[in-house]
């Protein structure tokens, strides 16, 4: 009898693991991935040079989560797979206003790259360059104006964009920090404040 109970218990645990895998698969099915850049790189070794492909991939759920990853391999598909897996592990959550744009304007930088993100009214669309557009669209933003200065390097542009997104704050979180009501912040933002600094002033 004890042996039978152990078997049943093991089966339950197995089914639990199966349900966990199913949930992970469902989450993966909801994700959108975009290949931003791929190039061939060479590494000098004692016997000569080894060539690999380097891939840059952005992954998001179009509902406020996004991440990016890099992968290297001798074959393009493997490099893309590695980059995609890394992007899934590095996803961040960004609060969106009305589920379509940013709560406030923001700036980000990485190395020589600088980006400016501006919240936009409905119908504006995603006005942004290639690497930035990939991040913003997979994040789920529908209306935004983005500008990049200082670099055309896709790696720096994406890192700078992610830097700007990490600084986004919703009225609820700002209100909690300031001990104010959300309604007060929203009213002040509608009067012309478009950044956390302006809201908190």
From Swiss-Prot:
It holds the Pfam family Ribosomal_S5. Residues 31-94 form the S5 DRBM domain. The keyword Magnesium does not apply. Residues 1-28, 173-201 are annotated as: Disordered. GO terms for cellular component: small ribosomal subunit. The keyword rRNA-binding applies. Keywords: Ribonucleoprotein, Ribosomal protein, RNA-binding, rRNA-binding. GO terms for biological process: translation. HAMAP family: Ribosomal_uS5_B. PANTHER family: MITOCHONDRIAL RIBOSOMAL PROTEIN S5. Belongs to the universal ribosomal protein uS5 family. Part of the 30S ribosomal subunit. Contacts proteins S4 and S8. This is Small ribosomal subunit protein uS5. It comes from Maricaulis maris (strain MCS10) (Caulobacter maris).
């Amino acid at each position: 009898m004890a042996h039978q109970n152990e078997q049943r218990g093991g089966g339950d645990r197995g089914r639990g693991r199966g349900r966990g895998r199913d949930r992970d698969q469902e989450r993966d099915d909801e994700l959108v991935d975009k290949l931003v850049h791929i190039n061939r790189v060479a590494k000098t070794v004692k016997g000569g040079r080894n060539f690999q492909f380097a891939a840059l991939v952005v992954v998001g759920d179009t509902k406020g989560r996004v991440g990016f990853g890099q992968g290297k391999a001798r074959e393009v598909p493997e490099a893309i797979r590695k980059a995609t897996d890394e992007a899934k592990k590095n996803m961040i959550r960004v609060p969106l206003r009305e589920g379509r744009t940013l709560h406030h304007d923001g700036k980000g930088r990485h190395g020589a790259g600088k980006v400016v993100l501006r919240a936009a009214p409905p119908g504006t669309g995603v006005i942004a360059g290639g690497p930035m557009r990939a991040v913003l669209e997979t994040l789920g933003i529908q209306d935004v104006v983005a500008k990049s200065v200082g670099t055309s390097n896709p790696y720096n542009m994406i890192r700078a964009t992610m830097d700007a997104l990490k600084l986004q704050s919703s009225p609820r979180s700002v209100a909690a920090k300031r001990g104010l009501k959300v309604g007060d912040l929203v009213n002040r933002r509608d009067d012309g404040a478009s950044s956390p600094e302006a809201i908190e002033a």
